[in-house]
């Protein structure tokens, strides 16, 4: 009788449920939500050291970098958009050589990972953490939720308004956006 029970416990679907439950319970014990360390904001964009870049770059006006790296056409087109709209004062491409903003999150398999959002954008009344997204993968919801929590905690700690904004390629390619505020309005409609 015990042999039959062990065989059933070894079925792939049962093993998956058991492992998933163990990961969830272990994460409750070891993953602790922390207030973000704000040393990143003590770093001035003007302190960024020159670096060589092996990816494509573009020259823009509203950024401290003389050439801004981009990974794909969506990023390039969004950079051009940021540089031309009136409600963006400044922006920077976030990567390890620039702002190095990393937000920890727990992925779909229960592993702790670091998420590096695409851009930090300054508007007259708020700071934005912006992610451009061509394809929605399995961890996007977890990254979005953690980045929203991060923005709320940083807002409370700095008395500056921080928000997270994900710009999907399908929305961006649809056009008709004349400001970053247009994307914030769209994002708030999509939440409800």
Predicted regions and their residues:
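Intrinsically disordered, low-complexity, repeat-rich regions
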Residues: 1-116, 122-128, 132-192
């Amino acid at each position: 009788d015990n042999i039959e029970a062990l065989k059933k416990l070894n079925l792939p679907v049962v093993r998956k449920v058991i492992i998933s439950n163990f990961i969830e319970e272990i994460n409750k014990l070891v993953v602790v939500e922390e207030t973000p360390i704000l040393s990143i904001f003590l770093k001035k964009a003007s302190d960024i050291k020159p670096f060589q870049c092996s990816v494509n770059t573009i020259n823009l006006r509203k950024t401290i970098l003389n050439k801004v790296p981009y990974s794909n056409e969506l990023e390039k087109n969004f950079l051009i958009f940021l540089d031309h709209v009136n409600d963006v004062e400044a922006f920077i491409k976030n990567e390890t050589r620039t702002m190095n903003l990393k937000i920890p999150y727990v992925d779909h398999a229960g592993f702790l990972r670091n998420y590096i959002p695409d851009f930090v954008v300054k508007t007259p009344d708020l700071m934005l953490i912006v992610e451009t997204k061509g394809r929605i993968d399995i961890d996007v919801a977890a990254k979005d939720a953690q980045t929203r929590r991060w923005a709320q905690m940083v807002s409370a700690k700095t008395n500056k308004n921080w928000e997270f904004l994900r710009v999907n390629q399908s929305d961006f390619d649809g056009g008709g956006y004349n400001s970053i505020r247009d994307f914030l309005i769209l994002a708030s409609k999509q939440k409800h």
